[in-house]
């Protein structure tokens, strides 16, 4: 796995509007569905990443423990041609298997 520099947006940065497919129910999820007054946790994850796999159970626990205080959403932006295990169908399988309490978007 290549080391890629990434940076965090400043806390309090307004999230841009977006629409992506929720792989679990095949519905379009809009950022406008979020509760406007609560903080949001937007996670960029994928099925094949060993770092994410290591935290699967913790993500589920965190989302369950804080579901009344935070809006959670996970987004995969991977290239499914190069990473077929990150396809929407596989994302749905994983979300159901792990019991995600949050939308898993592609």
Annotate the PLM regions.
Residues 38-39, 68-71, 99-102:
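Loop/turn elements at helix/coil->beta-strand transitions in domains of secreted/extracellular proteins
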Residues 77-79:
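Active-site loop/turn elements of alpha/beta-hydrolase fold enzymes
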């Amino acid at each position: 796995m290549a080391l890629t520099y990434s940076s965090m947006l400043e806390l309090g940065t307004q999230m841009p509007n977006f629409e992506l497919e929720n792989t679990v129910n095949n519905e379009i999820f809009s950022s406008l569905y979020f509760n406007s007054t609560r903080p949001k946790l937007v996670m960029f994850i994928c099925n094949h990443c060993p770092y994410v796999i290591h935290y699967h159970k913790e993500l589920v626990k965190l989302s369950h423990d804080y579901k009344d205080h935070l809006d959670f959403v996970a987004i995969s932006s991977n290239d499914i041609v190069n990473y077929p295990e990150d396809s929407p169908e596989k994302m749905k399988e994983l979300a159901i298997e792990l019991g995600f309490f949050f939308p898993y978007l592609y």
